């Protein structure tokens, strides 16, 4: 007997390891920005509109191109989208960023500039899709159909785009 599984109403997450090489002047500009402590050692750029700076125009264009692929080719949306807020998050090895989502936004994206090591992940979590909050099950293994948490491994040059309502952390 054959069966089919349909990932109905799934949440598509776009990720790509790019060949994008950050110029030294871009890295220097990022390092020259002012940062504020956001807790857990996570530092956020005080400027939440970094793509307005010409020094980062090449990075902005790269991000816009990936957003266009995600919205036009993956989601097949006719409308055009643009990046509003943009900021830098800095963390040292072992530091984390608490679970959060981005209200008043449609899509969120992360472009990784400098990842050290091979164990960096972008974590996601969601409410259970079946029997939400009523029953908890044990699983013989976890997969994309039964998990409430999932992650994507990332490295320098990786781009990840996802719906802004999706809770995420590092």
Give the predicted meaning of each segment.
Residues 1-79, 96:
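Non-heme Fe(II)/2-oxoglutarate
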Residues 91-161:
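Catalytic core of non-heme Fe(II) oxygenases with the double-stranded beta-helix
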């Amino acid at each position: 007997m054959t069966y089919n599984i349909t990932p109905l109403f799934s949440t598509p997450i776009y990720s790509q390891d790019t060949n994008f090489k950050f110029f030294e002047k871009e890295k220097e500009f990022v390092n020259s920005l002012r940062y504020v402590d956001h807790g857990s050692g996570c530092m956020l750029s005080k400027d939440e509109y970094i793509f307005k700076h010409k020094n980062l125009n090449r990075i902005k264009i790269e991000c816009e191109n990936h957003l266009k692929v995600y919205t036009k080719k993956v989601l097949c949306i006719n409308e055009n989208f643009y990046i509003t807020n943009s900021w830098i998050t800095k963390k040292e090895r072992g530091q984390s960023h608490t679970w959060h989502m981005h209200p008043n936004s449609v899509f969120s994206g992360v472009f990784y500039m400098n990842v050290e090591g091979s164990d960096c992940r972008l974590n996601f979590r969601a409410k259970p899709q079946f029997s939400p909050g009523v029953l908890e099950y044990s699983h013989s293994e976890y997969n994309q159909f039964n998990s409430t948490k999932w992650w994507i491994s990332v490295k320098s040059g990786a781009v990840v785009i996802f719906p802004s309502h999706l809770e995420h952390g590092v």
